[in-house]
């Protein structure tokens, strides 16, 4: 049986062999691995890029005080970004399942069409959910637009839901029963040992104690700071301010402080920031001459 951390190590080893830069999680609150600069920003422009990383993801509204066996306000994704998307991307994915000990001939693996959209990022793509014996474990996406900019070349994104994948591999019904590691002297460390208290306390904070007045003020500050930084222009710091605004919105949403009509307006404000950041980042790479594209050409010429 693979432990939770062995699943991560296996995926790291597999995607390392496929030429991916193995990166670290983005060190800010994000709702999904797509928000990492290694995906959102690197999907913009013509430069080639391959990366893989674990991303802790926060969705405050999904908290259940640690009482739901498969719904969390903090969970893990394993993200793979391939640009340009290779024609054999599905075969590469199946290869990763084999590395995890999943024999495609012995399991029901289905690709269910499910086009993807993230309104706050101004991003969308053609995609599929991957169902393993009736459980969704992965999302495939071919990005068409990011930050309102067309993706040329197309970026392929593979997002594994690590908890769901681990629940299948370990054959458990509750995320809290997952074995994180075997531990010293055979003393198992379970997911509940690592995260259950965090789920209880963060859910309590998100739903009951987060200050709406403070969060509204923070949102306005982060929005203003992102706009100011784009005028400099500093695309990457501006993106971080936009991410902070997005997480603040998610906290307000969980707190029930935003009405249905206000929600659409706030999403629009974040989307406008994302689009402006995307353009600023593209412009900054263009000013640099798209260095990774030039580097690839130089390497080819040298060969």
From Swiss-Prot:
It comes from the Bacteria. InterPro entries: aa-tRNA-synth_II/BPL/LPL (IPR045864), Gly-tRNA-synth_heterodimer (IPR006194), Gly-tRNA_ligase_asu (IPR002310). CDD domains: GlyRS_alpha_core (cd00733). One of its GO terms (biological process) is glycyl-tRNA aminoacylation. Belongs to the class-II aminoacyl-tRNA synthetase family. Its EC number is 6.1.1.14. It catalyses: tRNA(Gly) + glycine + ATP = glycyl-tRNA(Gly) + AMP + diphosphate. Tetramer of two alpha and two beta subunits. It comes from Bordetella pertussis (strain Tohama I / ATCC BAA-589 / NCTC 13251). It is found in: Cytoplasm. This is Glycine--tRNA ligase alpha subunit. It is an enzyme of class 6 (ligase). NCBIfam families: glyQ, PRK09348.1. One of its GO terms (molecular function) is ATP binding. GO terms for cellular component: cytosol. Its main location: cytoplasm.
């Amino acid at each position: 049986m693979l432990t939770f951390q062995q699943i991560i190590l296996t995926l790291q080893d597999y995607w390392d062999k496929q030429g991916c830069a193995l990166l670290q999680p983005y060190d800010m609150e994000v709702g999904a691995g797509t928000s990492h600069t290694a995906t959102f920003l690197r999907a913009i422009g013509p430069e080639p890029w391959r990366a893989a990383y674990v991303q802790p993801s926060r969705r405050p509204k999904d908290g259940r005080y640690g009482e739901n066996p498969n719904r969390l306000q903090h969970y893990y994704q394993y993200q793979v970004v391939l640009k340009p998307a290779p024609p054999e991307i599905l075969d590469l994915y199946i290869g990763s399942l084999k590395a995890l000990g999943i024999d495609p001939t012995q399991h029901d693996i289905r690709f269910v069409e499910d086009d993807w959209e993230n309104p706050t990022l101004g991003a969308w793509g053609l995609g599929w959910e991957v169902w393993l014996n009736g459980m969704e474990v992965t999302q495939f996406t071919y990005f068409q637009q990011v930050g309102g900019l067309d993706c040329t070349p197309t970026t392929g994104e593979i997002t594994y839901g690590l908890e769901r994948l681990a629940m299948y591999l370990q054959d458990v019904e509750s995320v809290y029963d997952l074995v994180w590691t075997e531990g010293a002297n055979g003393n198992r460390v379970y997911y509940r040992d690592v995260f259950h208290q965090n789920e209880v306390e963060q859910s309590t904070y998100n739903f009951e104690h987060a200050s709406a007045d403070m969060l509204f003020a923070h949102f306005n500050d982060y929005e203003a700071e992102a706009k100011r930084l784009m005028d400099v222009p500093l695309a990457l710091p501006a993106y971080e301010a936009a991410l902070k605004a997005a997480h603040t919105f998610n906290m307000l949403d969980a707190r029930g402080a935003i009405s249905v009509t206000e929600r659409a307006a706030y999403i629009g404000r974040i989307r406008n920031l994302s689009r402006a950041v995307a353009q600023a980042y593209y412009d900054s790479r263009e000013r640099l001459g798209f260095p990774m594209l030039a580097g690839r050409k130089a390497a080819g010429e040298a060969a």
